[in-house]
Curated annotation (Swiss-Prot):
Glycans are attached at residues 163, 179, 190, 281. Taurine transport activity is down-regulated upon Ser-322 phosphorylation. The modification Phosphoserine is found at residue 322. Belongs to the sodium:neurotransmitter symporter (SNF) (TC 2.A.22) family. SLC6A6 subfamily. Pfam families: SNF (PF00209). GO terms for biological process: alanine transport; amino acid import across plasma membrane; amino acid transport; beta-alanine transport; gamma-aminobutyric acid import; import across plasma membrane; modulation of chemical synaptic transmission; neurotransmitter transport. Keywords: Cell membrane, Glycoprotein, Membrane, Neurotransmitter transport, Phosphoprotein, Symport, Transmembrane, Transmembrane helix, Transport. The gene is Slc6a6. This is Sodium- and chloride-dependent taurine transporter. GO terms for molecular function: alanine transmembrane transporter activity; amino acid transmembrane transporter activity; amino acid:sodium symporter activity; beta-alanine transmembrane transporter activity; gamma-aminobutyric acid transmembrane transporter activity; gamma-aminobutyric acid:sodium:chloride symporter activity; taurine binding; taurine transmembrane transporter activity.
Length: 621
């Protein structure tokens, strides 16, 4: 087929096949329907809205508290080798794939796969399960940050001294620890830091285990309610509100990170901290765990396999050059992670010098960095209240825009399933309120005295790297080997005016699936049951619950395949051929061969087959 004819077919395909189903415009009101206006899917008011929304969605807490620690732990500068291999081999290709599918189909994270390849629409359901679980526990971090922010508005920070009601007789302030002769004469194991006691005894009121949940922490419950209310009002009007809020939430954290970077680099001991952060240890690359950490960090930091990037892309205009901006956003994301390491480790180097200990003794990851190491560092600086307020505002904004972008992706995907019902009147807003309320109630289990154990269980299993790798593999497999990488490239050319370099197509077909399979297998081989603080061992029932959370998303893909095959009549070969082919208004081919479509939503099954030119379907024709 000539190139012009091919492109014209693609234009017709997008117009007639992949166009949004009726009633999919956020904010469509009864008066619009009364005027007979055909509802159109809302689009970003400008490309800056999309760019800042994506930047806010994946530049989050993981860039600040996870990447620097992984870099130090896994060989310093040597860690960048597997990191960049996974970045160009899987991170950027999958990120762009999700955005461009959303833009091409104008659909959310579930219905886009129903139009591209109905048999594998379970990919969308798996993504929604993951992001729904993620939204429940990720926002708890913001509740902790909010609590710390409120506590920072004091002349003396409450975690700087041992004279509070929650402190124990074993609490020792750092001024005493610095007195080496006094410290050596005592047993270090018998004493704790005021910042640790504030975290464990005041903020968490930590119980003895997950089977002792204890009472609800009302102060944290109110903080959690506050951040959920902020999240709701940021997204309740769809992209009209989200696209404007990110002008502040996605840019201000970068300014504060720059301020913290400059401050950290001017502290004594900063040079040693940065050396510790980047000094390469090539021998660490022999450890498979280093490669697993690199792969999972890429998937976490790019917010892929969650349906959020697909939903954000679905609001792009059809001719928008998303390839260019996706590449620039990828550079921004990874660059932020790298620069954050300088800000964090310069301060950790200062801490180590002030305490007279090795940097390895103060280096933390995750909540340990945000709520123990850094709060401890600000107590050693001039103007500790100012730096504490600045840090927790930055932390709150970094997490908040990631949270509401992920919730927006979740809502868009679910609303697109039932547009004729949820797009009427104010039903979308009511639905968002219901989803946020349910997520808040589930999150209350994590702000009890045993809530930290529940939080760690969700973090370790519910949105684990294994789940994301599983989804990414099937996304690439479907596009490269069923829909056809060349077919998608034709669509991309029609949208942006040119074909991207072939490395994307090769990554979808070979490189990304290979990296996902390798990382997936090694993750299972190297699996270690969850512990808290390397001391508390979770009971067997909790480990089983954790695996249940992980499998709840992974099982969606094979489960949907089985359900669709069972609900479609005809010979198995014909059913498969019918279900792996994109839909078209004019029925032909398969139905003449005796396959009868299953009875699902009319928007999916009112069409039949587009003549395929991709690998697996061609072998079955």
């Amino acid at each position: 087929m000539a190139t012009k004819e091919k492109l014209q077919c693609l234009k017709d395909f997008h117009k007639d096949i992949l166009k949004p189903s009726p009633g999919k415009s956020p904010g469509t009101r009864p008066e619009d329907e009364a005027d007979g206006k055909p509802p159109q899917r809302e689009k970003w008011s400008s490309k800056i809205d999309f760019v800042l929304s994506v930047a806010g969605g994946f530049v989050g807490l993981g860039n600040v508290w996870r990447f620097p620690y992984l870099c130090y732990k896994n060989g310093g500068g040597a860690f960048l080798i597997p990191y960049f291999i996974f970045l160009f081999g899987s991170g950027l290709p999958v990120f762009f794939l999700e955005v461009i599918i959303g833009q091409y189909t104008s659909e959310g994270g579930i219905t886009c796969w129903e139009k591209i390849c109905p048999l594998f629409s379970g990919i969308g359901y798996a993504s929604i399960v993951i992001v729904s679980l993620l939204n429940v526990y990720y926002i708890v971090i913001l509740a902790w940050a909010t609590y710390y922010l409120f506590q920072s508005f004091q002349k003396d920070l409450p975690w700087a001294h041992c004279n509070h009601s929650w402190n124990t007789p074993q609490c020792m302030e750092d001024t005493l620890r610095r007195n080496e002769s006094h410290w050596v004469s005592l047993s270090a194991a018998n004493f704790t830091s005021p910042v640790i006691e504030f975290w464990e005894r005041n903020v968490l009121s930590l119980s003895s285990g997950i089977d002792h949940p204890g009472s609800l922490k009302w102060d944290l419950a109110l903080c959690l309610l506050l951040v959920w209310l902020v999240c709701f009002f940021c997204i309740w009007k769809g992209v009209r509100s989200t696209g404007k809020v990110v002008y502040f939430t996605a840019t201000f954290p970068f300014a504060m990170l720059l301020v913290l970077l400059v401050r950290g680099l001017t502290l004594p001991g900063a040079g040693e901290g940065i050396k510790f952060y980047l000094y390469p240890n090539i021998s660490r690359l022999e450890d498979p765990q280093v490669w697993i950490d690199a792969g999972t960090q890429i998937f976490f930091s790019y917010a892929i396999c969650l349906g959020a990037m697909t939903s954000l892309g679905s609001y792009n205009k059809y001719k928008y050059n998303s390839y260019r901006d996706c590449m620039l956003l990828g550079c921004l994301n990874s660059g932020t992670s790298f620069v954050s390491g300088f800000a964090i480790f310069s301060i950790l180097g200062f801490m180590a010098q002030e305490q007279g200990v090795d940097i390895a003794d103060v280096a933390e990851s995750g909540p340990g960095l945000a709520f123990i190491a850094y709060p401890k560092a600000v107590t050693m600086m001039p103007l500790p209240t100012f730096w504490s307020i600045l840090f927790f505002i930055m932390l709150l904004l970094l997490g908040l825009d990631s949270q509401f972008v992920e919730v927006e992706g979740q809502i868009t995907s679910l609303v697109d399933l039932y547009p004729s019902f949820l797009r009427k009147g104010y039903r979308r807003e009511i639905f968002i309120a219901i989803v946020c309320s349910i997520s808040y109630l589930l999150g209350l289990t994590m702000v009890t005295e045993g809530g930290m154990y529940v939080f760690q269980l969700f973090d370790y299993y519910a949105a684990s790297g294994v789940c994301l790798l599983w989804v990414a593999f099937f996304e690439c497999f479907v596009i490269a080997w069923i829909y056809g990488g060349d077919n998608l490239y034709d669509g991309i050319e029609d949208m942006i005016g040119y074909r991207p370099g072939p490395w994307m197509k090769y990554s979808w077909a070979v490189i990304t699936p290979a990296l996902c399979v390798g990382c997936f297998i090694f993750s299972l081989v190297k699996y270690v049951p969850l512990t808290y603080n390397k001391v508390y061992r979770y009971p067997d029932w909790a480990i089983g619950l954790g695996w249940g959370l992980a499998l709840s998303s992974m099982v969606c893909i094979p489960l949907v395949i089985v359900i669709l095959l069972c609900r479609t009549e005809g010979p198995l070969r014909v059913r498969i051929k019918y279900l792996i082919t994109p839909r078209e208004p004019n029925r032909w081919a398969v139905e003449r061969e005796g396959a009868t479509p299953f009875h699902s939503r009319a928007t999916l099954m009112n069409g039949a087959l587009m003549k395929p030119s991709h690998v697996i379907v061609e072998t079955m024709m």
